[in-house]
Amino acid sequence: MSTGPLVAGDALDRFRIVEAIGHGAFSDVYLAEQPDGRRVVIKVPHDALMGDVGAFDRFRREMEIAGKLDHPGIQHSFDGGEERSRPYLVLEYIDGITLREVERQAGRLPAPRAVDIASQLAAAMAHAHANGISHRDLKPENVLVTPEGRVVVTDFGIALMAGARRLTWRWLTSTMGTPDYMAPEQVEGKRGDARTDIYALGIMLFEMLAGRVPWEGDNPLAVMAQHVNAPLPSLREIDKHIPAPLEAIVTKCLRKNPDERYADAGELHADLERWQDLDLAAFTFGEDVVKRSVRDKGGLPLIVAGISAGFIGASALFVILYYVATHH
């Protein structure tokens, strides 16, 4: 049943629409109020999709996925329902801005800030992966950052749930995602899994550190081709002060072969936590990655220069010097 877009003052069940706040490929997003005045976000599929059984099933799957996830780093789902054959999803209202806006305001982020954001994202996605759910469209527009520094993943609209049947419909192609953040397997039309999310997280961490994505092009197809074929640019050639172990983490995330990436976000989160704690000896990125990251003659001084003395003591500095010396 087509009812047209909602406008301020409209009622949807017990919710009052305040304003439209987003228009995505598959749904409209509204700020709304409950009877007690609490603000929520309501997601409603486009009218144009309502006659498509596959689209309807996909939205219901998103509602099911939202109900399975309960983590401070994932936008919480309060409710869901249907009014006059129109399904809707009620989500937590988060007072924040997108990571894209953070990047616009700040440009390149300092390594500690970038790693903090990436670590929170990895922790959230570790929860999703542990529940058999892969996002498959992670990008700065789908990440909110609050004034207090909380980082929240949103929009599981094309997420994949383990064991679920494959849905196909006329609005959906096998190649789903956003070109700048698509893993090679997505470009090739494969479904993807947790390692696909790892790739997108790696792109976002690269972008926060470098101020740009690894690959750019005149059109989406040119960018997608580079994900499959082009070598990864060196972060430390862009900024020599980026520590080599941090570049190694990004490099592992962005392997072309999914089997060579972190298996899931839990592994990535552990390495990011170790970087924050400077526990280099416990990293999982592997000797070959470190050797490539520090093989230039200036590798050791650059690593040390990239880490503020205010964050480390003598023992941590010794670990860094010893690790690089024994793996150079």
List PLM regions with ranges.
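Conserved N-lobe ATP-binding subsite of Hanks-type protein kinase domains
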Residues: D28
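AlphaC helix of the eukaryotic protein kinase fold
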Residues: H46-K68
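Activation segment of protein kinases
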Residues: V53, P147-P184, E188
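Activation-segment/catalytic-loop signature of the eukaryotic protein kinase fold
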Residues: G80
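Conserved short submotifs of the Hanks-type protein kinase catalytic core
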Residues: R84-T98, V102
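Activation segment signature within eukaryotic-like protein kinase domains
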Residues: I117-A118
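Protein kinase catalytic-loop region centered on the HRD/HxD motif
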Residues: A123-I133
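C-terminal lobe helix-coil module of Hanks-type protein kinase domains
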Residues: M125, T178-F283
